[in-house]
Amino acid sequence: MYATMESVRLQSEAQQLAEMILQSETAENYRNCYKRLQEDEEAGRIIRSFIKIKEQYEDVQRFGKYHPDYREISRKMREIKRELDLNDKVADFKRAENELQSILDEVSVEIGTAVSEHVKVPTGNPYFDGLSSCGGGCGSGGSCGCKVS
């Protein structure tokens, strides 16, 4: 019974933490950028084009430079990727997304290291993965040098 009550309390506190993050300026900025991105017709056109060319690019990559359309599709992919990256709404959204992800990474590492310095907390962020005992994505087999308990 005690473990169940403790689990309920921990989940409740985790929900409170999630609510605090949701109410943060960073999360609000993320939602605003996402909304602006969704409402922008030009960004939508670029994203749809990117998805279409990406599918073609993945098909071409199976055969590599031996595919007859390899050069053309690769060129189109670079062009649309550049157009996507240079779009203000897309850039703002990516920046907001990275800022929110940084907060989530910080919280994950903080909680993990508070429990134990040996807890593996892969974040996908090289800075935070260096602070954790896990190099990220190791499958906890210890081959990355992390401390497997």
Curated annotation (Swiss-Prot):
Main subcellular location of this protein, as a coarse class: cytoplasm
Q: Name one Pfam family in it.
A: Com_YlbF
**Highest taxon listed in the record's lineage:** Bacteria
Q: Does the keyword Cytoplasm apply?
A: yes
Write out the entry's keywords from A to Z: Competence, Cytoplasm, Sporulation
Q: Where in the cell is it found?
A: Cytoplasm
Q: Which Gene3D superfamilies match?
A: YheA/YmcA-like (1.20.1500.10)
> Could you tell me what this protein does?
Regulates sporulation prior to stage II. Positively controls the competence regulator ComK at a post-transcriptional level. May modulate the translation, stability or activity of ComS. May work together with YmcA to regulate community development.
The name this protein carries in UniProt is Regulatory protein YlbF
What's the source species for this entry? Bacillus subtilis (strain 168)
